[in-house]
Regions:
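Intrinsically disordered, low-complexity, charged/polar segments
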Residues: 45-104
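Functionally constrained cores in energy, signaling, and assembly domains
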Residues: 8, 29, 35-36, 82, ...
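Residues in flexible loops and secondary-structure boundaries
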Residues: 17, 40, 78-79
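Hydrophobic beta-strand residues in large extracellular and virion-surface proteins
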Residues: 3-9, 30-32, 40-42, 75
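Basic/aromatic-rich interaction segments and small domains that mediate binding to polyanionic partners
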Residues: 23-58
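Positively charged, low-complexity intrinsically disordered regions
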Residues: 3, 12, 39-40, 68, ...
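Short coil-to-beta transition motif at edge beta-strands of beta-rich domains
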Residues: 1-21
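Glycine-rich, flexible loop segments associated with nucleotide phosphate handling
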Residues: 22-29, 63-69
Length: 104
């Protein structure tokens, strides 16, 4: 799954407050070079991103739905499947801090 300019990417991380949070930004540029390959650029939140990594993380995130795990600390595409899954997990994790552990 390749993302396009205007699509959103996100990352689940713990904030300094100890709360889990979804950090997100929109892709505003996509480049392809011999040196770096295909990369996604966002306006402010994330540095240039390896597009293949983000695409693979998006696929992994979609496949994790209903399987008892979620990607944390990895950037993935936010779509109609991954966004609600991430938001639901973050709500659960912040209500169950003793059970929510970022493993992947």
């Amino acid at each position: 799954m390749q993302l396009n300019v205007g699509d959103s990417v996100g990352q689940i991380n713990k904030a300094s407050s100890g709360e889990w949070k979804l950090y997100e930004d929109k892709i505003n540029k996509i480049t392809i070079t011999k040196k770096y390959g295909r990369r996604y650029f966002t306006k402010s939140v994330f540095y240039p991103l390896d597009a293949d990594d983000v695409d693979n993380n998006t696929k992994d995130m979609e496949e994790s739905i209903g399987r008892g795990y979620i990607l944390t600390k990895e950037i993935f595409g936010l779509n109609e499947k991954t966004r609600p899954y991430a938001e639901k997990w973050i709500k659960w994790a912040n209500e169950n801090k003793d059970k929510a552990v970022g493993l992947i």
